[in-house]
């Protein structure tokens, strides 16, 4: 026992001990707080499966599609690696989106955790970029045309747009140079995400985790191990079952059948659809007819998320005690689901109009956030004043009865 304690005092092990074993955690956190560790698990799965897949993948336009088929047919366990990697990306986004909306509901972006939130938004942006360039690598029809459409959006940037597109492509069209660049970046970015995740964790542990009540307490806390560890372990088991259902029974249900057709620059798919986790942002992009306006709207999405901690005016963190904000939060959730549905529909009426209305609704939430905090503060103040008057009236009535 003494030897174990002496080892834990060494610099590297003490850091590990302070952040993952003895880390003081609020005793009332729920299972919603387990999605952070699940996101870390998903990242590890993606990195490990990606490294092994890269050993058999060939980043060349003539061989990329065939190398993926080689992995599926000839590499022992290759089908499992590919399906774990492809479905692992979807699981990663599911977990991160739930983690994100939990933070939004319980006010985890509020002071003093602004840096934690901003790092989380940066990680989300890195995930989207990594997933997009990874989707290009199989070099199927949807991969090729998705890369062509999305990268060409950079041409909307004034003055330097065309230069950026040429630099991204490595030429004047999506070709072998593009595939090589995307493969290199797709291999690199997960490690950058891992580094950003460590910074995210360090920033979180500077002030401690939030809790469902949204209050600060340095007394009512417990060690992460074994209490929170066991709670997270339950979530890991449930996640493993959910993940396994997709990997073993429905591995292609979240993909697109057109991507099993080799890329053909001479044949455009009837409907170019990105992966499901891009659909809300893709719907906002499509809702604006002007290309530059669409790109600006995507940028505004992430600017709004980054600005949220600084435009928040509420003194109460948790939406459990903010009934007005709670309603707007659920409207935002419904709006994001609607945007996701619109993103996979054809660009025609009435989907375009619905997408435009839903896009306005998305940004309306961030526009009204500062007003909600002030309105709720005024309601609380008036409620306290009414309660004080009621107590005073009751007290005076009691005094009068006693005197009588």
UniProtKB/Swiss-Prot annotation:
Domain of life: Eukaryota
GO MF term list: metal ion binding; ubiquinol-cytochrome-c reductase activity
Co-factor requirement: heme b
Gene3D superfamilies, A to Z: Cytochrome Bc1 Complex, Chain C (1.20.810.10)
Protein localization: Mitochondrion inner membrane
GO biological process, one term: respiratory electron transport chain
Entry binding sites for heme b b566: 99, 200
Co-factor binding details: Binds 2 heme b groups non-covalently.
Keywords: Electron transport, Heme, Iron, Membrane, Metal-binding, Mitochondrion, Mitochondrion inner membrane, Respiratory chain, Transmembrane, Transmembrane helix, Transport, Ubiquinone
Secretion signal span: none
Keyword Transport: yes
Transmembrane segments annotated in the record for this chain: 35-55, 79-101, 116-136, 182-202, 228-248, 292-312, 324-344, 351-370
Binding of a ubiquinone, residues: 205
Membrane topology: Multi-pass membrane protein
PROSITE patterns documented for this protein: CYTB_CTER, CYTB_NTER
PANTHER family reported in the protein's UniProt record: CYTOCHROME B
Protein family membership: Belongs to the cytochrome b family.
Protein name, UniProt field: Cytochrome b
